[in-house]
Amino acid sequence: MIQKLGAKGIKSDERNQREWDDGSEHDDVTKIYVRGGREGIRSIYFNYVKNGKPKDGSIHGYFDSGFTQTFEINHLRGEYLESVDAYYDKKSYGMQAIQFKTNFRTSELMGYSYECTMFTLAVQGKKIIGFHGSNYVHILSLGAYFISIAPTRLEVKGSKGSKKWDDGFDHENVSKIEVLGGFEGILYIKVDYIKNGKLETGLVHGHSGGDGFLQKMEINQSKNEYLVYVEGYYDDASETIQGLHFQTNLNNPVMMGYKKGRKFLLASNGNKIIGFHGYADKSLNSLGAYFSTTTPNKLECQGDRKGLPWDDGCNYDGVKKVYVDSISDIDSVRFEYDNGGKVEKTPYRRDVTNEKEFVLDYPNEFITSVEGTLATPTNFDITWILSLTFKTSKGRTSPTFGSSSPGRKFVLEKNGSALVGFHGYIGPGYNIKALGAYYRPIPPTPDVKRLEAQGGDGGASWDDGGTFNSVRKIYIGLGKNVVGFVKFLYYKNARVVIGDDHGNKTLSSDLLEFLLDPFEHIISVEGTYDDTSGGITMLRFETNLQKSPYFGFGTTSNFLLHKDNHQIVGFHGKSSNMLHQLGVHVIPNGFKFI
């Protein structure tokens, strides 16, 4: 049900005041444009998504001289707009500043809030899908439309050849899990929930009369504990789940059953499980889950919380690289994240003169802690960060960036968790005044392996990464006796991720395509390269369903990229105006990044 919050701000008696209304027929807000000037916010407009398609909003106010600030919301990754803080000044007769908050991060303050009155647009448990308000010379007032947040449903892993069951998703949390295991696998599962603040006893799904071993797991509601993922093991021959490994946000893992069979994962970007569904009869044949969003797990800033705030957000899978600029103290820090399979590098926040890198072996390695030193406060109670050191899940420690001067130590760490996003403050001197982080439990090891690239000499290295679910489509461009260009489209979190161009597309006379079905995956790549040109001259792909045509020149291979019982989920290599080398990332059959 849609809920409308009335517009707040300045009520004007001017005849020229214009009221506007974008309506509530949207799925999400995707981008916000705010245009400000010396006298406040002059105009604002919003982009939406409706029925899965983009919809541009109208400009409200005067789009004339001034500056425009934007804030994008990645609805494809489950991000949505939760609330708005706005500031108005009756003396200057208009809105002066505005700030937006999603379920993952907070925008910078757009405008100036000095000596202003603040109001907030927010409804607990709901998201914003539309705006309305009024304007004259400035934006005068703002209101919003809200709707309840729908849970994410992950389909069952396993077989569907028995009785279907569904506990639903109208719960606040899981309370207790009970599993009966036997020699043939999991015989039944029973889950109790918290609904409307009260305990709801679940039903038995499977066969409760058999012999076996009973295992139980309780979720500690008083400590705000919740399930973040389930790792399961499924036997194709018996069509029965053999084991279930449950993981909570407090890093309390419980294994029920056996680690036998094909591995699968039920997870949704750090969200919490609020319900299960599946198929069962004489045993548990499959399992799926419902997820709801959670409040970000946030480690507060250490240091001086004065200056300009910045917030990378927490909607990332992990950190791939750290950049630190330092001559004596820490002048700047920024990060390269994995955002749903795409590399996202945070922007420069100041000029850098001595930037150094710390590279992680992601997705097999995560940042687990940051140790820092703060300068001794001055007479004006001012401090800043002197040094930073990063530690990883593989036991590695980065070099210490910054100054070796003594100061107050601090640590950003949550036991058993990975740091997946950062926030902080920049001081008037544009050095780092404070640093905080977002964390989530370290995901199960994906067992990603990197098979070295094969081919000739030359070219610059590239790497699409290996955290995708599968390959969707391949483009191959052929030049003069050589493969001149390749490009890969991948599946990640049920959406298509477009890889970068590798090689020279414009020099390729023929552009060929190889399209895979949604349940098809690549198991090997064979090819040929020419020692004289250093370029690859032929490629052929084999999937679990078919072999592709020969792309290029010739049919005799001199290299093969393959690992038994694994599937290819990403590519790397070298290229210039042609493709010189090609390598792959592989994961065990049955494992998927969710």
Swiss-Prot record:
The keyword Transcription regulation does not apply. InterPro entries: Jacalin-like_lectin_dom, Jacalin-like_lectin_dom_plant, Jacalin-like_lectin_dom_sf. One of its GO terms (molecular function) is carbohydrate binding. Residues 1-23 are annotated as: Disordered. Keywords: Lectin, Repeat. Disulfide bonds: none annotated. Residues 10-23 have a biased composition (Basic and acidic residues). Residues 2-148, 151-293, 296-441, 448-588 form the Jacalin-type lectin domain. Belongs to the jacalin lectin family. This is Jacalin-related lectin 44. It comes from Arabidopsis thaliana. The gene is JAL44.
